[in-house]
Structure formats: structure tokens, C-alpha cells
Regions:
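Active-site core of glycosidic bond-cleaving carbohydrate-active enzymes
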Residues: 1-95, 100, 126, 133
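Beta-rich accessory regions
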Residues: 38, 68-162, 171-176
């Protein structure tokens, strides 16, 4: 049972990308985007804990999601926009552009990142921050795109992640 209003379960549908069955992720994502979010009193299932419900919708509507918080990797889902751009530092932009996207065309046929074919449903945060174009061609029927995924290596960024410095404890104020 999938309960979208229970935020800890939001990543469940993306497990299919890791099991080399990304068409199932695309199908479920489509069902949630169009079935559980809409304009109306019940158009947002569950509660909006710190913006997680909205963040899930916005990222997936653009066609990707950060499956594992803290890991600099995005998994590709089912975009609903024809084109959307994210403004980045240093006048860069990351644009997601779809080809043949429609309500019926919910499956991914092929993906290119800056003109280079992606054969797995993953890209890194580093790639997003470099800017460029993620082009997603859609299909009305499930495809074999992304079925040769080897996500273990994709978890590692090109550069090591810098550890966060520990926060110094705050000393309590003395009563005057």
C-alpha cells in the first residue's frame, strides 16, 4: 500500500528505477501527479510538513527527484511540463525540455543531458549545477530506456563531498 500523505514513503515509487524497471516509476509518478494533486479542498493529500508535499510535486513535475536526501544524485521520473528552467548562480540555467510530452505520453523513450545520451535514470547534483539542458523524449508505451541502470557507481560524485564542520554548542546565558 502506498500512502502519499506519509512523507517518509515518498521515495518508494523510485525503487523501480534502481530495479531496472523505470517505466513503472514513470507510470506511478504520472498517477500521483495527476491523481493526488489538483485544485480543490482535497487537492493535497496529507499535510504539508515543512513543504515536502509541494517539493515532491515540483521536482517530479520537472521530471526528477532526489531519492535519498543527502546524496547528490537525482533520479528521473515523469515530467509534466513542456519546458521548465531553473536559474542557477553565475547566470547559468538548467532546463528540462520534453519532446512529445502529453497526458498519454507518460513513458520515457530517451534522455539527453547537454546532447549526450543518458542510458540510466540518474544524474548528479554537480551536473545540474553546471547548467545545461536535460532533454526527455516521451512515449505512449513503456520502453526499455533506463533498464541497464547501474546506480551504485552513480551515487558517487566526481569530487569528494566535504564534511560539514560540527556546530559548537551554545553556552546558556547566565541569569542576571
Amino acid at each position: 500500500q502506498y500512502a502519499h500523505g506519509n512523507e517518509p514513503g515518498h521515495g518508494t515509487i523510485f525503487l523501480y528505477n534502481y530495479m531496472r524497471e523505470p517505466w513503472r516509476t514513470q507510470e506511478l509518478c504520472d498517477s500521483i501527479l495527476y491523481g493526488l494533486y489538483y485544485a480543490g479542498p482535497n487537492g493535497l493529500s496529507g499535510n504539508e510538513d515543512c513543504g515536502q508535499m509541494s517539493a515532491w510535486y515540483l521536482l517530479n513535475a520537472m521530471g526528477f527527484y532526489q531519492f535519498c536526501p543527502g546524496r547528490p544524485v537525482y533520479t528521473i521520473s515523469r515530467p509534466i511540463f513542456g519546458e521548465v528552467s531553473i536559474s542557477l548562480p553565475n547566470n547559468r540555467q538548467f532546463t528540462v525540455r520534453t519532446i512529445g510530452n502529453s497526458r498519454q505520453n507518460k513513458y520515457i523513450r530517451r534522455v539527453r543531458l547537454n546532447g549526450v545520451a543518458l542510458t540510466t535514470p540518474f544524474f548528479t547534483h554537480e551536473q545540474l549545477m553546471e547548467g545545461g539542458v536535460l532533454e526527455i523524449e516521451m512515449s505512449a508505451t513503456p520502453t526499455k530506456w533506463g533498464t541497464d541502470a547501474k546506480p551504485v557507481k552513480l551515487y558517487m560524485p566526481k569530487r569528494p563531498i566535504k564534511p560539514i564542520k560540527p556546530i559548537k554548542p551554545i553556552k546558556p546565558a547566565r541569569n542576571r
